[in-house]
Structure formats: structure tokens, C-alpha cells
Amino acid sequence: MQNFGKVAVLMGGFSSEREISLDSGTAILNALKSKGIDAYAFDPKETPLSELKAQGFQTAFNILHGTYGEDGAVQGALELLGIPYTGSGVAASAIGMDKYRCKLIWQALGLPVPEFAVLHDDTDFDAVEEKLGLPMFVKPAAEGSSVGVVKVKGKGRLKSVYEELKHFQGEIIAERFIGGGEYSCPVLNGKGLPGIHIIPATEFYDYEAKYNRNDTIYQCPSEDLTEAEESLMRELAVRGAQAIGAEGCVRVDFLKDTDGKLYLLEINTLPGMTGHSLVPKSAAVMGVGFADLCIEILKTAHVG
């Protein structure tokens, strides 16, 4: 096996997704240790990143979610320290974390994305409701794990929802409702893995359904996708990742309309690795166990 040296599993951090990161990090740490890797937990909230060098770490497995973890900040710090790390580089991480600018790139390249609008204090909210229709989704562009996502169903409600969300960093976007199903497709080293059909017991795949409930149904392989649709989803996932320069292990989320058309929703450049997480479920269908998946991701560690 490749010699990775002393490995820091970067987990925790400062974002609203701290607890999820700690869960993912603990699972990864145990998996790496089970494979004989000299791995240790490292929480930047508790210990400055500059200590990585002082403590002799040679590789970083980054599983820091959200702000400062997957937005290019920690990636830049690791570049300066010269420590190889897993996941995408600075630019791809920053773009992937920004749903608005990621959508602009996908649109420019002709990839299918749901119609959306950016909201501001002076937005004509009635016009946006008329344009996108109801229901619609409103979300912060720079949050993950469905933090701050609201389904707007009532006419005249858009402005008040915007007021509730505008304290979040970055743009607030409204998005047309696509009602044919939710899906996700991991990409590892430029190869699309089996897609997953997500059937939440809640109204949509929100934070509660992702992390706190056990009644969300995950179909992998998806029972309602044809072979052609599955192939297209994998192709679109790979193209979506390549469009922003994402590397290593990523996950692209999709919506399917009632007419069967697939839309790219967003990309996660540092997907979760908890017991509820989607990438391990997809890898398992390919015959790759959790510990082996962690090793494959660790092999992608890089600088530059």
C-alpha cells in the first residue's frame, strides 16, 4: 500500500455543519486505522492549522464541511503549508460552495439547471413568484446540508422568507420547483458511480431527513431510472464536476422533472461520510466497502 505518512483527518471546524463533519471524520478515522494508516483526528477549531507541520503530519484527509472547510479557505492554507490534501483545489472548492456561481458556469456550458433568480432587498418578489411559479425553493447560496432551505408554497410569502434568510453569507436564490424526484450521483476520479434515488418521508430531502431520520429511502441502483437515464446522470455528473475543475471524490445532486428530464441541482466537493451518507452507499453497490473507499479517496491527496 502507498505510504501516506502521518495522516491528519481534518474534522469539526467552524461551520454550521460542524457536527456532521465530526461524525464523518470519526468514521473515516476508524476506517483508516483499520487499514493500518497512521491517522489522527485534527480539529482546526481546537488547534491552528499551522500546527500540522509542527506535529509532523504529511497528508491531510479533509472532511471539513461548510465555511472554511470546503470553500477554498483550508485548501489555500494546506497549499501554503505544502501538505497534500484530499478533495478539490482552491478555485473548484470556492465555486462548488457557491451555488449561484456554480449554476452560472453550468448554464454557460449548456448543462441543464432549474430556472432560478437571485433575491435582493429591492427585488420585485411578486414578479419572481409569477416567473418561477409556486411552490418554489429558496436557499442561501453558500450553505450546505440543506441548511436554510425553505419551500415557499403560499402566494406573497417569498419576501418574508427572504427576510428570514438574508442574514446568511452570500446570495439568496429562489429556484423553480422540479417535482419528479431527487437523485444524487457520486464521481470518483472522474468516473460516475451508481446514482441514488432519494425518497424522503419529509416534504423534501432537508437537514432532518439527511441526518436525523431513519425513514428516508435510498434506492441504489435506482429502480425508476432506465439504463439510458442512469447513463445520462453519470455523464452529467462527470461533466458538472469537470466544469468547475472538481477533483477526487465529489457528489452531484439532481432533480428529475415529471417529464423525465434531469436537472443538475448542486455539487458537493466534500461529500459526507456518515452512516446516512450517499457516497458510501453508491460505492457499496460497486463492491467497494467503506474502509477501501476511504483509502481510494486518500490516494487522491495532492498539492496544486
UniProtKB/Swiss-Prot annotation:
Mg(2+) 1 binds at D253, E266. It comes from Neisseria meningitidis serogroup A / serotype 4A (strain DSM 15465 / Z2491). It catalyses: 2 D-alanine + ATP = D-alanyl-D-alanine + ADP + phosphate + H(+). GO terms for biological process: cell wall organization; peptidoglycan biosynthetic process; regulation of cell shape. The lineage of its organism: Bacteria, Pseudomonadati, Pseudomonadota, Betaproteobacteria, Neisseriales. Gene3D superfamilies: 3.40.50.20, ATP-grasp fold, A domain, ATP-grasp fold, B domain. GO terms for molecular function: ATP binding; D-alanine-D-alanine ligase activity; metal ion binding. Belongs to the D-alanine--D-alanine ligase family. This is D-alanine--D-alanine ligase. The gene is ddl. Keywords: ATP-binding, Cell shape, Cell wall biogenesis/degradation, Cytoplasm, Ligase, Magnesium, Manganese, Metal-binding, Nucleotide-binding, Peptidoglycan synthesis. InterPro entries: ATP-grasp, ATP_grasp_subdomain_1, D-Ala_lig_Van_CS, D_ala_D_ala, Dala_Dala_lig_C, Dala_Dala_lig_N, PreATP-grasp_dom_sf. One of its GO terms (cellular component) is cytoplasm. Cell wall formation. Transmembrane segments: none annotated.
